[in-house]
Amino acid sequence: MASTFLSAQSQNPFGIPSEEAPAPSSNIVAAPGSRAQGWLNQGRSEVIARHGVVATSDSLAAQAGLEILQQGGNAIDAAVAAGSVLDVTSQNDTGIAGDLFALVYIAAEKKLYALNSAGWAPARWTPEFFKKELGLDRVPVTGVNAATVPGAISGYDAMLNRFGTMGFKETFERAARIAEEGWGQGERRHRDIVSAEQRLRQDDYSAEVFLEDGKAPHLYSIIRNPDLADALRLMQEEGRDAFYKGAIADAIVAKVQSEGGVMTHADLAEFESEWVEPINTNYHGYDIYQLPPPGQGFAALEMLNILEVCAPEHGVNLAALGPSHPDYWHFMVEAKKLAYSDLQAYNGDPLFSAVPVTELLNKNYAASLCDRIDMDKASEPSVKGGLDGGTIYLTTADRWGNMVSLIHSVFSVYGSGSAIPP
């Protein structure tokens, strides 16, 4: 990940020793599986900072978050700034029309908050609509009828309104400038756009914005997106209403309905992010938190339960084995298969289906799965997936001890493949 940090007047947990925290570094733990236990040839250096950290998959985004911290903003402001830059430079994975989930830790309250900003389905999305009107047996993966109401902008707004010190005016500035002036397309994004050429060619505006004569731009090309810059500038002036009730909403509805979609102004205007209670498990003394459904985080917690409960049953000591031992990876993979099987079987929208999170995260349930792990052979995965993906992760921490952990996604590479013209 691209990381950056700053030097300024410090407060713990990243600062100099104080009466309240005589050894702040005592909270920094080198986990088994780090460079000290097997990754001796890892090329990237750790980032160690006293006053705040921004970690993203893109150096420009990390720099944007850093700028906000230098200006006196907090971790929430920095997360929105970094995320908005990724909405420009990483549209293979994310964008202003994506969804967002965030965990926000407020140090002054010693409390963790969870934000679900996954957009809901248009009101007319029913099984009958897809089966009878479109002749489909499932929701498509491309085109306007693959896209739900965008949740990301509402999520940014909710975070800033509740915990931030800035607004879109400040936090979107770097993103808007990058969209106007351009950025370099590196290897990862070039690979993704090459793989998505056919998807993008199916949409005239996507082809115009992302391709050159129907082909992916050359590696290391400088990319600009002035229309996206205009949208960001509009939101700097008018806030979230520009997206959900104003000119951007008009453009979304016009595009979707012109191509047989059923998203309406009401679908957009009525959407609100939701603050929810985080879920958690305890793994060897550490409390680990995730978003509840419809987020997929309970699978990670279930996997940790399986590792903790089942490893001793099989005589496996993961810490002692370390990441250079095949049994370490075998056990990890088998635990993940079991957790992902339950994810696919049970996860859904809790407004419409009961997801038995409490039962799935009970350690007695994890114990019931132990005999399904065979240390001598791999099990058959219950779900087979492709290599496609479209998600970013970022995290921020500030001098006051506030922290944000955020996922922002368009589900697959370049999402539905449909872009909205101005």
Predicted features by range, described:
Residues P32, P312-V410, A419:
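Internal maturation/activation junctions in enzymes
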Residues W125, V413-P422:
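A short, polar/charged loop-to-alpha-helix boundary motif
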Residues E302:
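Protein kinase glycine-rich loop
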Residues F298:
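Flexible, polar/acidic helix-loop-strand segments at domain edges
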Residues S3-F5:
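N-terminal signal peptide c-region/cleavage motif recognized by signal peptidases
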Residues S10-Q63, E67, A75-E238, F243-K245, ...:
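Noncatalytic scaffold domains of N-terminal-nucleophile
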Residues W120, F411-V413:
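A short acidic/small-residue loop/turn micro-motif
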